[in-house]
Amino acid sequence: MSQDFSFTPFPDLETKRLWLRQATQEDTEAVFAVFSDPKVTRFHDLDTFTHLDEAIGVIERWVRSFENGRRIRWGIARKQDNYLIGSCGFRWDEEVNAAVVGYELASEFWRQGIMSEALHAILQYGFGRRGMQFVIAEIMLENVASRSLLEKLGFQSRGVLKERGFWKGEHHDLEQFKLTRSEFTAV
């Protein structure tokens, strides 16, 4: 069953410490700060940003992708000052009523439970309000922290996909994880 994921307005979400909201051009410097850190882009398919224009372009793509119903990308902002410290979101697969999840967080906020909190909120949204059947995540094999995060959220490894990704001039083996609606509600 196919589901229409084109929707408006943008669904803002709230957690104990975070606002999950649409990024705007006012967030350009914050987005640049995240993606100009080589520690953040090490496992990412984007090159490390060197110009503010790259952040402007990413925000524009996030907005366009939401407007055409293909993807949704939430900016992760601290409640205390609404400052954007990362992002997370889904790329919809309407054919199977599912999504692929992606995420990144400014390195100074790693290992504080922030991404776990943000992903839990968007998974609740995806499974509860959008009726998704499952979510897929694909990570580089060396990304131990991401593997730990996914396992904590209940994702199960489905194995390694050889040369699944190609970026930064080379092929990458990726480990694929899957979380079904029933597995998420059981966690």
Show which residues each predicted segment covers.
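Hydrophobic residues in alpha-helical segments
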Residues: F35, H44, F66-E67
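Conserved GNAT-fold acetyl-CoA-binding loop/helix
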Residues: K39-R61, I72-W74
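A generic secondary-structure signal
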Residues: R61-S65, Y125
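Acyl-donor (CoA/ACP) binding surface of acyl/acetyltransferases
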Residues: M1-T41, R73, A77-V187
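A short hydrophobic/aromatic micro-motif that marks alpha-helical segments and, especially, helix-coil
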Residues: H51-D53, F66, F184
